[in-house]
C-alpha cells in the first residue's frame, strides 16, 4: 500500500517529536547546585543537559540570597569556591562599583581570595559564564509533566541466592512533550519533583521525636526563642473581644503536643534586594489585592514599641541588601505554604503569588499607611527595590 505524501510527512514529524534527546546525564533544576553538577559532568567529558523550568539559573543564589551562610569558609572548595573566587575577581574591578566606592564596603578585602556577599544579577552573570565556559547545554522554560513525566525500568537481579529489584529512570517528559533520556538523572530542584515522581520516599513536615529516637524534632514550643513577640499584642478583630474573631494570620488552635510531628513546614519569603541609593531606587509597589487589615497585627505590635524592622538587613555591594525575615511579624508569610511541597503547579503558583502580595503589601503598608508612626515611616521610605535587579520581573525576586 502506498501512503499519501501528507500521511508520510505526518508520521515522520510524529516520530521526530516523540524521539528523546539523549545525554549521558540530565540535570533537572538550575539552582546553584544544579549548575555545579552540570559543570562537573561536562568537565568529566560526559554529555549533559541542564533543564531549568524558569528563565533563570542560580535559584536563591541569584534570587536575592546574597548573604552566604558560609560557616567555616576554609572547608568550602571545588566549584562552589570557584564561584566565590570569580565574584571576588569581579568586585576587584573598578567598574563593578557604581553606587559606592569599593573602600567603603567593609566586606570586600583585596587580600581575600573570595567574597561571600554579592548582588543577585552578578551571581547569575557569573553562573551563566561558568556554564558557557564548560559548554553546558541549558534548556529554559521546561517543566516536568507531573502526571506522567517519569518513565522507569524495573529489573530483578540475583546475587548469592538473593533477589534484588532495582528501579531506574529511563526518560523524563516535559509538559511541552519534549523527552529526555540519560544514563543518569540528577534532581537539583528545590521541590524534588523528579525525585518524588520516581518513587523515592520522603517526608513533608516535621517528624516526631519518636520517629528516630531524637529530641529536637516535631513541635518545639519550649525551644522557641527567636522571632517571638516580646510584648502582649491584642489578637482580636475588635480589641478585647474574643467573639469578634482573630486577626488575619493568626491560628487559634493548640500548637500540638511537644515533640510530635505534623504537616507544618518552615515559612517562606522572598529575599528582597533593596537599596537606599536614590538613583537606583524604585518605590515599593502597591500590589493588586492589597488589604491593610492583613497588617493590623503588625500595627498593634509597632504601637507597642517594636522598631527593629531592619534586624536582618544585610549589606551587599553597591548599597544593596539581602533583606530577610526578622521578628514575630515580618517578611515570612507564616502558615501559608503548607500545601506547596506536594502541590501541583497551579497550587504552587497561587501560593507564590499570595506570598508576593503579602510581602509587597507589607512594605506598601509601612511606607503609606497614615497610622504607621512617622519616625518609622521616614526610615523605611529611604529604601526601595533595586532598579537594576530582576529587571524582567518588576525588580522583584524570581525565586521564593
Language-model segments: residues:
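Flavin (FAD/FMN)-binding glycine-rich loop and adjacent Rossmann-like elements that form
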Residues: 163-170, 177-184, 188-400
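Beta1/beta-strand and adjacent pyrophosphate-binding region of the FAD-binding site
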Residues: 21-31
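Bacterial N-terminal signal peptides
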Residues: 6-15
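Conserved N-terminal/central alpha/beta ligand/cofactor-binding core
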Residues: 46-47, 52-146, 156, 203, ...
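N-terminal Rossmann-fold NAD(P) dinucleotide-binding loop
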Residues: 34
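Aromatic pocket-lining residues of Rossmann-like dinucleotide-binding sites
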Residues: 41
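Second-shell loop/turn segments in exported
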Residues: 26, 69-72, 111-118, 181, ...
Amino acid at each position: 500500500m502506498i501512503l499519501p505524501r501528507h500521511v508520510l510527512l505526518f508520521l515522520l514529524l510524529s516520530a521526530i517529536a516523540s524521539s528523546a534527546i539523549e545525554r549521558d546525564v540530565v540535570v533537572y533544576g538550575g539552582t546553584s547546585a544544579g549548575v555545579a553538577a552540570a559543570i562537573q559532568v561536562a568537565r568529566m567529558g560526559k554529555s549533559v543537559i541542564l533543564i531549568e523550568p524558569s528563565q533563570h539559573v542560580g535559584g536563591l543564589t541569584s534570587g536575592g540570597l546574597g548573604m552566604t551562610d558560609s560557616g567555616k569558609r576554609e572547608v568550602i572548595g571545588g566549584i562552589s569556591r570557584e564561584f566565590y573566587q570569580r565574584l571576588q575577581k569581579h568586585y576587584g574591578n573598578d567598574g563593578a562599583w557604581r553606587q559606592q566606592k569599593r573602600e567603603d564596603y567593609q566586606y570586600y578585602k583585596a587580600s581575600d581570595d573570595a567574597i561571600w556577599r554579592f548582588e543577585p544579577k552578578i551571581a547569575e552573570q557569573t553562573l551563566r559564564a561558568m556554564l558557557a565556559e564548560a559548554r553546558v547545554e541549558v534548556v529554559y522554560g521546561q517543566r516536568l509533566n507531573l502526571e506522567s513525566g517519569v518513565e522507569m525500568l524495573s529489573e530483578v537481579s540475583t546475587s548469592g541466592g538473593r533477589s534484588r529489584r532495582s528501579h531506574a529512570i529511563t526518560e523524563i517528559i516535559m509538559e511541552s512533550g519534549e523527552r529526555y533520556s540519560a544514563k543518569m538523572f540528577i534532581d537539583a530542584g528545590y521541590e524534588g519533583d523528579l525525585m518524588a515522581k520516581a518513587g523515592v520516599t520522603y517526608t513533608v513536615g516535621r517528624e516526631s521525636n519518636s520517629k528516630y529516637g531524637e529530641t529536637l524534632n516535631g513541635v518545639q514550643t519550649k525551644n522557641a526563642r527567636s522571632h517571638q513577640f516580646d510584648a502582649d499584642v491584642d489578637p482580636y478583630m475588635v480589641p478585647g473581644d474574643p467573639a469578634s474573631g482573630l486577626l488575619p494570620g493568626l491560628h487559634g488552635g493548640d500548637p500540638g503536643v511537644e515533640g510530635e510531628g505534623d504537616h507544618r513546614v518552615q515559612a517562606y519569603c522572598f529575599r528582597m534586594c533593596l537599596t537606599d541609593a536614590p538613583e537606583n531606587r524604585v518605590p515599593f509597589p502597591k500590589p493588586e489585592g492589597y488589604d491593610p487589615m492583613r497588617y493590623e497585627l503588625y500595627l498593634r505590635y509597632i504601637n507597642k514599641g517594636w522598631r527593629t524592622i531592619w534586624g536582618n538587613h544585610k549589606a551587599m555591594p553597591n548599597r544593596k541588601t539581602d533583606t530577610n525575615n526578622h521578628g514575630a511579624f515580618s517578611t515570612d508569610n507564616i502558615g501559608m505554604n503548607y500545601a506547596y511541597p506536594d502541590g501541583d503547579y497551579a497550587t504552587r503558583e497561587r501560593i507564590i503569588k499570595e506570598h508576593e502580595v503579602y510581602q509587597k503589601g507589607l512594605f506598601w503598608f509601612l511606607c503609606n499607611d497614615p497610622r504607621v508612626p512617622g519616625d518609622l515611616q521616614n526610615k523605611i521610605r529611604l529604601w526601595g527595590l533595586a532598579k537594576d535587579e530582576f529587571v524582567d520581573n518588576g525588580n522583584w525576586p524570581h525565586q521564593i
